[in-house]
Amino acid sequence: MANAWRTARVFISSTFRDMHSERDYLVKVVFPALRERLEPHRVHLVDIDLRWGITEQQSENDEVLALCLDQIDECRPFFVGLLGERYGWVPKKLPDAGSKYGWTQHQTGKSVTELEIRWGVLLGDVMRDHAFFYFRDPAFLNDVPPAKRTEMTSESDEAARKLAALKEVIRSAGLPNPVVEN
């Protein structure tokens, strides 16, 4: 079975509202090019972009975080993190303490994006070698039309502080792949 096809799943983590263009570029340009390069090696690449994969019912039933973390588990060891100036949505309800994701009970006030990054990369070694982080340069906002800029700026001063702290944790985590900032 040396010639059997293998599947590589890549989880894309970011806030949704401000990273549409970056996610679109990955999905429409980068991943198709990677698929082409991997096909001769019998590797099927699947990108997991949950922008369109979360239903209204899942949102209403507080299932979003568990769904995201489940998908990260399915994608191990591949993780791509995109961070701009938004911290992201903070869930009001976290998974039950007795569940697989009970560790989140001590993470009150953290965004889904931060919890994805912690679960996927920072809390274990499985994804460290295959995690890639890209931080968008805040100066980028200078070129964004004012009407769109509000969707790409921090939700609040507190959110900006949390995001800055998260970025620093990622930078200082000793990951083998350097954080790309531009």
Task: Please place each PLM-identified region on the residue numbering.
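Conserved catalytic or regulatory cores that recognize and/or transform ribose-phosphate-containing ligands
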Residues: M1-N182
